[in-house]
């Protein structure tokens, strides 16, 4: 259950931050970066955090379930599991982001990173704190 708590707590928070950053960059809002713009950005992030969890908790838990399934497959090492979960997060976020009016390579990458980074970060944290140590067997 620690794995799902990690994915549910970390995933939407990081994904929402990256989604706000991606839409800010894509809209051309940050032509000049100064402390006033950064404070407005962080204020908007804090104000929209509740909606980030509202819309992000279910996809984060779904990716957490995929990570849990891959954890129980003994032949998949941690690094491969991390890459698979990241690729699934990237693909899911890219497909969801393709519904936006803008399209192109930059939109594809920015929307994909919104799913890639939280999925890989949550999987790594779950590996550190939720996975039981595996016994080492001699041949």
Model-identified regions with their sequence ranges:
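Juxtamembrane/disordered regions of integral membrane proteins
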Residues: 1-139
